[in-house]
């Protein structure tokens, strides 16, 4: 009897720099372990695969109290002008220091590993994103298409 290949389904709903890493790292790692992987990018998660936004994802320090900082500051200071830029710059510095790939590099790694990437049609309609705005290789489909994949998954994650 032939073993069925393991499958992992991920929903990526956040489009910030810090929240783009978990689905892409998990997907690329699972694919390297010979797991069939699909990521459904919905709501702000579509920004991760949007050519116009992929290189400018940001980190919002407000409501992110666990964010490491060389200088501790109260969470309320996150509302001040320039704090998002500062937090983004700090995170990019930490990422570079530990030699992690950038988000565009991770997306390429996922594509090369055969990770199926699906952008949510209703989200695209709601936000005015066109198929041409997406990076090459991203499918466009609704929830039913993703659920068809996810219903047979061994692991389902919502990030």
Annotate each language-model stretch with its function.
Residues 57-92, 99:
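A glycine-rich helix N-cap at a beta->alpha junction
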Residues 83-117:
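Alpha-helix-centered segments that form part of catalytic cores
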Residues 45-58:
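N-terminal beta-loop-helix "entrance" segment that forms/cooperates
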Residues 31-32, 111, 150-151:
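Anion (oxyanion) recognition and catalysis
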Residues 10-20, 49, 94-98:
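Short, glycine-rich nucleotide/cofactor-binding loops
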Residues 21-33, 39:
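Histidine-anchored nucleotide/phosphate-binding helix
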Residues 37-43, 118-121:
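Short internal beta-strands
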Residues 95-96, 119, 124, 132-159:
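Glycine-rich, aromatic-bearing surface loops/beta-hairpins
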């Amino acid at each position: 009897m032939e073993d069925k290949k393991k499958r992992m389904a991920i929903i990526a709903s956040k489009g910030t720099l810090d929240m783009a890493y978990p689905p892409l790292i998990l997907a690329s790692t699972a694919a390297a372990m010979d797991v069939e992987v699909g990521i459904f990018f919905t709501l702000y998660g579509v920004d991760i695969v949007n050519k116009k936004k992929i290189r400018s994802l940001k980190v919002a320090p407000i409501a992110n109290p666990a964010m490491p900082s060389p200088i501790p500051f109260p969470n309320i200071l996150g509302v001040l002008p320039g704090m998002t830029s500062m937090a983004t710059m700090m995170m990019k510095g930490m990422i570079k220091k530990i030699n992690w790939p950038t988000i565009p590099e991770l997306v390429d790694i996922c594509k090369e590993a055969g990770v199926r990437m699906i952008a949510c049609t209703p989200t695209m309609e709601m936000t005015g994103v066109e198929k041409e705005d997406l990076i090459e290789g991203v499918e466009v489909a609704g929830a039913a298409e993703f659920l068809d994949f996810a219903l047979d998954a061994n692991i389902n994650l919502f990030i």
